[in-house]
Amino acid sequence: MGKVIGIDLGTSNSAAAVMMGGKPTIIPAAEGQTAAGKAFPSVVAFSKEGELLVGEPARRQAVTNPDNTIIAAKRKMGSDYTFKIQDKEYKPQQISSFILQKIKKDAEAFVGETVEKAVITVPAYFDDNQRQATKDAGTIAGLDVVRIINEPTAASLAFGLDKAKEDMKILVFDFGGGTLDVTIMEMGGGVFEVMSTSGDTQLGGTDMDKVLIDYIVDEFKKKEGVDLSQDTTAMTRIREAAEKAKIELSTVMETDVNLPFIAHDPSSGAKNLELRLTRSKLDELIGPIVDRCKPSIQKALEDAKLSNSDINKIVMIGGPTRIPLVKKFVSEVIGKEVESGVDPMEAVAMGAAIQAGIIAGDVTSDIVLLDVTPLTLGIETLGGVREPLIERNTTIPTSKGKVFTTAADNQTAVTIHVVQGERPMATDNVSLGSFNLTDLPPAPRGVPQIEVKFDIDANGIINVTAKDLGTQKEAKITIETKTKLSEEEIEKLKEDAEKFSEEDKKKKEKIDLKNEAESYIYTTEKLVNHDLKDKISQEQGIKITDAVKEVKEVLDKEPEELKPKLEALQSIVNEVTTELYKNAAPPPGADGQQGADGQQGADGQQGADGQQGADGQQGADGQTTESSSNDETKTN
């Protein structure tokens, strides 16, 4: 099996890692370090020319192209929401697949081989719709998603808690850009068992950004009398500045927000936004958001039947956990200091890589990961009541069945409506789908015995079977969630993704050819205007200059136009320099000179004084000298 990578597909930032030399190593993004370190922004954009941009390049142009830029797509995973960009609609899975496609490409460049398999993490509180959408995104990106694991489980692996000698109970506080997960795990004898999980899929660092953005907008309005909230470009700049200030205030006590020319007044001209932010002001603004985390901590403890004092370790992951107020809050709620030593922005990806390494056989480990289902699974019964089959926080993989009957006389079919959630009425929970068991023999109500059985695999994906115990007739399905894509849809989206990949390849080829042409033009002009100025004829000079001009005119054109012009220029230069070389060479056999058989260089004709060879490569000085020891020709 080839390399299996671990991926943290985040709301605000994403990261990937792979096992190298027995250790998880973060895969660097092609664009290098970002504000988030080795992670990169989960931002997707389309330029005005339709070019796909992912990561830091997408984030950088968001100010000037906000309408075609998508942030926090993960918050829409599992829903039927669509993003409208340039008269085209994109599903959340497709936007996420662009991020995963970039990760795949970066990983292949890093490990030097094709990467086809991945372990992807999801928030522990993700329902089946969201998990299935994540798998679909991986498939569209050309990845075989061999395992979906919960982010807290991955983080615990990254912190090395599997190597602890004593049994322990770990609270993982996962506060990301868009979701909060609080998970309590028990570790002992190499077994990680999730005892409980709680959280909020709509609470995260982006909520902090929002209150900070609102504060900046309000302060500017008070000072300048201008409301920037409806100015898309201004708001994009402010959002970027707010996120930057939030990150900076994690390590310094104050920072300045400076946004010149943020607005224009016809009477007074351009207006600049200048504001000093302090950590205390940030704490004041985000305090209510941090307080909203407390119920999730309490619920996780309650479900695990534990008290604060039972917790041995606290693991913090996610960008917002770098904020001192967040660390202090969790520490005070539990009454224990938090663990350190692993970057909270990288922990999940590193843990996913460890799990990937176990699957690939790169890591020898006795670790067993036992996750739980985050929400209760059940079906809708008479009157719209939800009947639970698998309770929340049940260890998975698992299987459980229950026998039901018909609600009417002579009923020949039943509809099984599967729901996920904690509300007593089916309509108040998340609908995962429905299916029919048909051709039942007519019978009085209450007589047929229909067993409904739920199977949940290690990825949290649900399969349901309904069987008539009288006739043994059964229907088996994998839950087709409302957002699950058909094979045809996935194939089409894969083709779209490959199209963008092909466009990227063509773009690179175009840039490489342009760079080659510009370099050749520079060298040629140097030859004509300096090195060979007194050695070439006027006719030769005009011929070369005209050819250079023709290349310059098509520098920004497609390779089909540029390449023939460049080759024509190279041919003219080679022809002129070869003629000069022949004219300058003394007759064969002259004392100490290289004979005719020494004129051929390694890759083409060797030119005088730095001339180009046939393959376009430049020699250092181009002079040929005879070696006194072995008669070989070499370039000085």
Curated annotation (Swiss-Prot):
<feature type="compositionally biased region" description="Low complexity">
    <location>
        <begin position="590"/>
        <end position="623"/>
    </location>
</feature>
<dbReference type="GO" id="GO:0005524">
    <property type="term" value="F:ATP binding"/>
</dbReference>
<dbReference type="GO" id="GO:0140662">
    <property type="term" value="F:ATP-dependent protein folding chaperone"/>
</dbReference>
<dbReference type="InterPro" id="IPR043129">
    <property type="entry name" value="ATPase_NBD"/>
</dbReference>
<keyword id="KW-0143">Chaperone</keyword>
<dbReference type="Pfam" id="PF00012">
    <property type="entry name" value="HSP70"/>
</dbReference>
<keyword id="KW-0067">ATP-binding</keyword>
<protein>
    <recommendedName>
        <fullName>Chaperone protein DnaK</fullName>
    </recommendedName>
</protein>
<dbReference type="InterPro" id="IPR013126">
    <property type="entry name" value="Hsp_70_fam"/>
</dbReference>
<comment type="similarity">
    <text>Belongs to the heat shock protein 70 family.</text>
</comment>
<dbReference type="InterPro" id="IPR029048">
    <property type="entry name" value="HSP70_C_sf"/>
</dbReference>
<dbReference type="InterPro" id="IPR029047">
    <property type="entry name" value="HSP70_peptide-bd_sf"/>
</dbReference>
<dbReference type="GO" id="GO:0016887">
    <property type="term" value="F:ATP hydrolysis activity"/>
</dbReference>
<dbReference type="GO" id="GO:0031072">
    <property type="term" value="F:heat shock protein binding"/>
</dbReference>
<feature type="region of interest" description="Disordered">
    <location>
        <begin position="579"/>
        <end position="636"/>
    </location>
</feature>
<dbReference type="GO" id="GO:0051082">
    <property type="term" value="F:unfolded protein binding"/>
</dbReference>
<dbReference type="InterPro" id="IPR012725">
    <property type="entry name" value="Chaperone_DnaK"/>
</dbReference>
<dbReference type="GO" id="GO:0051085">
    <property type="term" value="P:chaperone cofactor-dependent protein refolding"/>
</dbReference>
<comment type="function">
    <text>Acts as a chaperone.</text>
</comment>
<dbReference type="GO" id="GO:0044183">
    <property type="term" value="F:protein folding chaperone"/>
</dbReference>
<dbReference type="GO" id="GO:0042026">
    <property type="term" value="P:protein refolding"/>
</dbReference>
<dbReference type="InterPro" id="IPR018181">
    <property type="entry name" value="Heat_shock_70_CS"/>
</dbReference>
<keyword id="KW-0547">Nucleotide-binding</keyword>
